């Protein structure tokens, strides 16, 4: 879909090409595959511009504002393991991420609310009480489940709770959002 639109175009016209592709894709939604496809084109265009000019991306977008950027380690992915094995692995991975010099860590959940709380407890044990950890749910909960997990994460001092419910679950969330 995108290739015929940009194949003979000058890749240095990054803004023009980006808007041309975006205008074609925006009717298909502003998330998911259309935007992921546009992101791939955008990255390629920036890469081409950097190679042609011999400049880093930071220089192309206005200059470097810092020499170091704090980053978090992402691990603790779900696998087909029994819960005790997952808990042990999550605790060990979290500890390893902390000892590697990251400023925080993020874990994946999605087994079920009670099991996920146990996994979060394992991560907290692995990193100790003074290290930020985040939880990525990828919309795996109903609102009631998200509230249950969210309260438990608050007790564990989780730094953030990402995407607990599907954004289109308007019926589920309307009772929990102040008018």
PLM segments and residue spans:
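Conserved, mostly hydrophobic/aromatic
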Residues: 2, 41, 54, 105, ...
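Active-site mouth loops of central-metabolism enzymes
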Residues: 67-91, 109-110, 137-143
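N-terminal small/glycine-rich loop or linker at the start of catalytic domains
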Residues: 58-83, 119, 124-130
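A structural motif
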Residues: 99-104, 158
């Amino acid at each position: 879909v995108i290739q015929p639109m940009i194949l003979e175009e000058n890749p240095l016209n990054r803004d023009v090409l980006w808007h041309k592709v975006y205008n074609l894709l925006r009717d298909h939604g502003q998330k998911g595959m259309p935007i992921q496809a546009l992101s791939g084109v955008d990255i390629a265009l920036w890469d081409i511009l950097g190679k042609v000019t011999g400049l880093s991306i930071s220089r192309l977008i206005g200059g470097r504002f810092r020499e170091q950027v704090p980053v978090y380690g992402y691990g603790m992915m779900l696998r087909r393991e029994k819960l005790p094995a997952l808990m042990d692995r999550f605790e060990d991975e979290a500890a390893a991420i902390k000892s590697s010099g990251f400023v925080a860590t993020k874990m994946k959940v999605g087994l079920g609310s009670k099991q996920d709380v146990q996994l979060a407890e394992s991560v907290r044990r692995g990193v100790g009480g003074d290290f930020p950890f985040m939880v990525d749910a990828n919309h795996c909960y109903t609102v009631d489940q998200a509230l249950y997990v969210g309260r438990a994460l608050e007790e564990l001092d989780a730094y953030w709770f990402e995407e607990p419910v599907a954004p289109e679950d308007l019926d589920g969330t309307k009772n929990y959002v102040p008018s």
